[in-house]
Amino acid sequence: MITFKRLSSARWGALLTSIAVLFFLAITKGADAKAGADLADIQAYRRLRTTTADAYYASEDRVFSVVKALKDLAHNAKLTFSLDKQLKVNNRFEVLRVKQVKTDVFSSSEFTDWAHYVAKICKRGRLPADRAIFKTMAAHYGDDELARMLATAKRTSRDTVVYQLKEIQQKSWKESGKSADDVYAILQLDAGGQNVLNNPGLPAWLSYVKSPSTDYIEALLLKLREQYDDVTVAKMIVSSQSGVNKRISGQLEKELSTAWRKNHITEMEVFQLLKLNDAGTTLLKNPILEIWFHYVWKMKRNDPYELLVSWFKKAGIDDAGLGKMIATAKQDDRNYWIAQTLEQRLSGK
């Protein structure tokens, strides 16, 4: 009689996998195991791995877990292609040690070799192969971690695969009924505090909330305003204007200005709203002053420089003080153009 405890880790894992697959084939003979995209289906075989670490599961626990998992798979029968092929995809993932890659997984040779293998054994086109890749990676990494991996993936020759995986994940979220707030949390967009606009996962969230009835930039502004006041949102916009999401930042600034305009907020009210009136002699170096300038120009009612001069007088800043402010601001990388133009206006040039 064979004593299971005396089997080597490798033989134990192989024996369990063989028993599980044979069991599945026995109970699913003639069953239709065709396409679908349910993430839960493949989560089950995560414990079929035959690595040394897996050998330390309690023997009874492992056997019954495998059997139950395959029963569930047989019941659902929603795999992209047959389970034996899906298991081959998973096995090759482990053999190539894709999960051992610590950075830039999608640009690694391990992932490339694995993706080529999946495409080769899948005879039904690119999409089923991508679904099999998604199922396997989601089973190994978890949905949340995979979402962040896709969001931070660098541009490579495998961009098409990454794009398809993102599409599959978005569909998976919608089918499982995840809300915009759920996806916001999955992508950990608030993990960096006020650094949301620099988060590489932001485009994925915007894509998720976008619909014929939903303006995604408006949705973003509403989301940010739930947590921050307008001056903080303005600072966030400014700090992300040269980052990975600079296009989104520009759109968000326009949306913020539109919101002010719809609420009939005047130029000087926005000046106070952004707390520029508290800046004192550092006003010309304040990074969000530019946002105020853009709003004044959008309103097309006043000259922002004339409004500034009027404010300087009310604030008790004399010509000498203003001259020092201009000289200092001209050295500023962001607002030098405001200082230069103001100087020219005051000198009559």
Curated annotation (Swiss-Prot):
Main location: secreted
One Gene Ontology cellular component annotation held by this UniProt entry: membrane
Entry keywords, A to Z: Host cell membrane, Host membrane, Membrane, Secreted, Signal
Motif RxLR-dEER location, chain numbering: 46-62
Leader sequence residues: 1-33
Domain remarks in the Swiss-Prot or TrEMBL record: The RxLR-dEER motif acts to carry the protein into the host cell cytoplasm through binding to cell surface phosphatidylinositol-3-phosphate.
Family the UniProt entry places it in: Belongs to the RxLR effector family.
Function: Effector that promotes P.infestans virulence in Nicotiana benthamiana and potato. Attenuates cell death triggered by the pathogen-associated molecular pattern infestin 1 (INF1), indicating that the effector suppresses pattern-triggered immunity. However, it does not attenuate cell death triggered by a range of resistance proteins, suggesting that it specifically suppresses INF1-triggered cell death (ICD). Targets host MAP3K VIK in order to utilize or promote its ability to negatively regulate immunity.
UniProt protein name: RxLR effector protein CRE15
